Structures are given as structure tokens and as C-alpha cells.
């Protein structure tokens, strides 16, 4: 593609801890990323498109996911201490907590129950856990492995979704 004329992003308060990602929602472009405490949603010229006033405590290599909640698009990412942060495209945030997660968990998003909304898939040590975005548990299983890696999601069809795990 061509460089965007007028690209002039604001400076972050702290070093960036997530990938800089582009999402297109309802015919609008959103550039999203996070530093240690703030979440940024910019337009394609680097100006703030959505103000997120909440403060977070994020770990390095925070992943940001676009999914749906209640039929509406939202951005989801995890904080320290098992927190799940949900940010909508008006800048409103919701935070829930999943008890019993270490700071070494891995996370992905999957529509576990086929209802069209994202659910959170965690691996933590030898445990696999799926919760709703509000932290309500849907599934949990302990595996024989000592430490599970990132939980990959494979969608073969609308009704055939599988999770791939490594140890």
C-alpha cells in the first residue's frame, strides 16, 4: 500500500507492550495498541479516534483481540492477575477477573459455545480454561503435560472449531 499522508501519532506515556494492530469495524479504520498502563485507539492518521480513560496494569507482549460481545464489536486483552479487559468502540471498559491464574498464562479468543460472542481460552501450567468475557467459567480441564503453550484455535467450519495445544 501507499503511506498515509499526515501520519502523526501521539507519543505514548510508557513503552508499548502490545503489537500495533489495524482493525476495520463498520467501515472505519482503527489502529490499536497498549503501553503498560494505557490503551490507545487511533485513526489512520495517528490521531486519537476513541478515548479510553481507564488505566490498566498490562504485562509485556499483551495480545489484543477483536471479537463480539452482545452482538457488538469489542477489543479484548488480558492484564496482570487474571484480569480480562473489554473495550468497546465508544471507549467504555469492563474488567473481570479469572481466579487462580498465574502471571504466566497464555490467552486466545474463541466462540466456544457457537453463540456469536467471543469467549476467552486460557492455558496456565497444565490447565485449559474457557470463560465468558465476564469471567464466567465454561470449561476447565487439567492435562497430563507439565506446561502447555499458546492455545491455537482452528476453525474448520462454523460448527467445527478445535483447539491445538503443545507442551
Regions picked out by a protein language model, each given a short descriptive name:
Residues 1-167:
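Extracytoplasmic/lumenal domain signature
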Amino acid at each position: 500500500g501507499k503511506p498515509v499522508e499526515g501520519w502523526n501519532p501521539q507519543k505514548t506515556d510508557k513503552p508499548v507492550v502490545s503489537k500495533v494492530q489495524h482493525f476495520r469495524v463498520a467501515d472505519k479504520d482503527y489502529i490499536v495498541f497498549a503501553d503498560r498502563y494505557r490503551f490507545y485507539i487511533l485513526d489512520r492518521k495517528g490521531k486519537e479516534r476513541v478515548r479510553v480513560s481507564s488505566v490498566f496494569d498490562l504485562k509485556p507482549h499483551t495480545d489484543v483481540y477483536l471479537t463480539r460481545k452482545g452482538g457488538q464489536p469489542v477489543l479484548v486483552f488480558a492484564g496482570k492477575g487474571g484480569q480480562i479487559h473489554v473495550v468497546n468502540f465508544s471507549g467504555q471498559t469492563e474488567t473481570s477477573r479469572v481466579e487462580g491464574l498465574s502471571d504466566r498464562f497464555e490467552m486466545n479468543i474463541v466462540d466456544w459455545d457457537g453463540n456469536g460472542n467471543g469467549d476467552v481460552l486460557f492455558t496456565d501450567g497444565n490447565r485449559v480454561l474457557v470463560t465468558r468475557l465476564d469471567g464466567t467459567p465454561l470449561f476447565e480441564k487439567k492435562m497430563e503435560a507439565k506446561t502447555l503453550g499458546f492455545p491455537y484455535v482452528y476453525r474448520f467450519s462454523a460448527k467445527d472449531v478445535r483447539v491445538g495445544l503443545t507442551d
